[in-house]
Regions:
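Nucleotide-sugar-dependent
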Residues: 283-295, 309, 314-315
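Active-site proximal beta-strand in glycosyltransferases
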Residues: 106-108, 121-145, 159, 164-166
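Short hydrophobic beta-strand element within catalytic cores of glycosyltransferases
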Residues: 304-307
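A short, active-site helix/loop in glycosyltransferases that binds the activated sugar's phosphate group
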Residues: 153, 158-193
């Protein structure tokens, strides 16, 4: 299924990016963190430039990834827990990307575990040599996974094939570099230190100062071990023994307790409208945490979160944030919030000057060296072969990649990307989604 929008073949797209997905929430892709990140990357880049076309590999069509400059190509892909990290169907991918007819200048991989295979597939089975960049949403380590075997080594091998790989925080970068020392040489660890860079995730907008329901506590995370869900329930059970004037709301799991209620919300708008009514949110992450989008969702709506004073959270909200806790002080902090209205106001007053910098618009555009990675693509010298391509385009005025290759008699063994990169620099040639055209003056 391709994009709903009808393409105009004469629209100039200097760069074509192929996105390799990371699917962990198949039952509702709109809520998958990968989709949330990619949607905001495309949206923010579209505000400042119109020369990128995105081809997104996906197991299902995702409405929120539907833009004028995107297309979605369907591939079979398993999902969580980690089958998607082990699955790679080279024949299907080759068929779908249609390399004889299509161009890809950059591969934006959101699944590092498959990036080494993906790079080899391009370099050895097509005539395309794209730049590889990426984002790692998750690293399988003992601190967050109870699998007998994990894919951490495979993940890092994929990262080593990238020019740059984003992670959600400096804390996570340092955590993974420490883990990598158990697996790789000093030279490879140094490479990882250069490749892995913090790409802070964002919020849609800042909308504080809403009326809230007093003494409500929001747990809007998954019920996994790494989120501290079991420990949180134990703490709430203890609190309920001494007071029954609070209520816990969950959004992703059912909690069978007299003090708890699950809410099921059908859209992001409905979700945020609910979140902003909460007195407080909580984060109970123990030994590992991604940059919690569920936490920043709440902060953006004026809901302060009680957060662990470790992992990425001092980096997220600052070391002086008044609701950072050590485990022994968790219930004391919760009760202070329940009983002292000023505690909520103090936390929001602290956050107010920080939140504008949380917006996606201020974060995405700084990634990949302000996206200058797109400008650093290998260009062929002015060869006889290049001149033949240039003359063919000028004579025909508008041609496809396949027509050029057939004219030259070139197949998979003649690299194409460096020729395309030189064509991009020609003042009289423009690159469109599927064609190379002479600019009419």
């Amino acid at each position: 299924m391709n994009n709903f929008f009808q393409y105009q073949d004469d629209k100039e797209y200097k760069y074509k990016i192929l996105v390799y997905p990371n699917i962990t929430y198949m039952k509702d892709l709109e809520k998958d963190s990968y989709v949330v990140v990619l949607r905001n990357v495309i949206k923010e880049l579209n505000k400042v430039r119109d020369d990128i076309h995105w081809t997104i590999l996906s197991p299902k069509h995702v409405m929120s990834l539907q833009f004028e400059n995107t297309e979605q190509l369907m591939i079979d892909m398993p999902s969580y827990p980690n089958k998607m990290r082990t699955h790679f169907n080279a024949d299907e991918i080759l068929k779908v990307i249609d390399w004889r007819n299509s161009d890809y200048d950059v591969v934006y991989s959101h699944l590092p575990e498959q990036t080494l295979a993906l790079k080899n597939l391009f370099h050895n089975s097509t005539n395309i040599s794209p730049k590889i960049i990426g984002y790692s949403h998750w690293f399988e380590v003992k601190e967050n996974s109870n699998y007998e075997s994990t894919m951490l080594a495979q993940n890092l091998l994929g990262v080593l094939e990238m020019d740059e790989c984003g992670v959600n925080s400096i804390w996570l970068k340092e955590f993974i570099i420490k883990k990598s020392k158990e697996l790789f040489s000093d030279k490879q660890v140094k490479q990882l230190e250069e490749i892995i860079q913090p790409h802070y995730l964002g919020i849609d907008d800042v909308s504080p100062n809403h009326k809230y329901e007093p003494k409500t506590i929001l747990f809007n995370h998954r019920d996994n071990d790494y989120t501290g869900y079991g420990w949180f329930v134990e703490q709430m059970d203890e609190l309920y023994k001494t007071r029954q004037d609070f209520k816990v709301f969950t959004t992703l799991t059912n909690l069978d307790r007299p003090y708890a209620e699950r809410v099921k919300l059908s859209s992001r708008k409905e979700y945020l409208n609910f979140v902003r009514k909460m007195h407080m949110g909580v984060g109970c992450f123990k030994t590992y945490s991604a940059w919690s989008i569920s936490t920043t969702d709440g902060l953006s709506q004026g809901v302060p979160y009680v957060l662990p004073n470790k992992l990425c959270y001092p980096e997220m909200v600052g070391k002086d944030y008044p609701l950072l806790y050590n485990e022994k002080d968790f219930l004391t902090t919760i009760e202070s919030m329940l009983d002292n209205p000023n505690a909520r106001e103090e936390a929001n007053t602290y956050l107010a000057p920080l939140l504008p910098d949380f917006k996606w618009s201020g974060r995405v555009l700084s990634w990949f060296d302000n996206w200058k990675q797109l400008d650093d693509l290998k260009v062929i010298q002015d060869t006889d072969g290049y001149q033949r391509i240039l003359k063919f385009i000028n004579r025909r005025k508008s041609v496809t990649k396949k027509e050029i290759l057939e004219h030259l008699g070139w197949g998979v063994r003649v690299g194409w990307s460096s020729y395309r990169n030189r064509l991009r620099t020609e003042p009289t040639i423009k690159l469109t989604k599927n064609r190379y055209e002479v600019i009419n003056k």
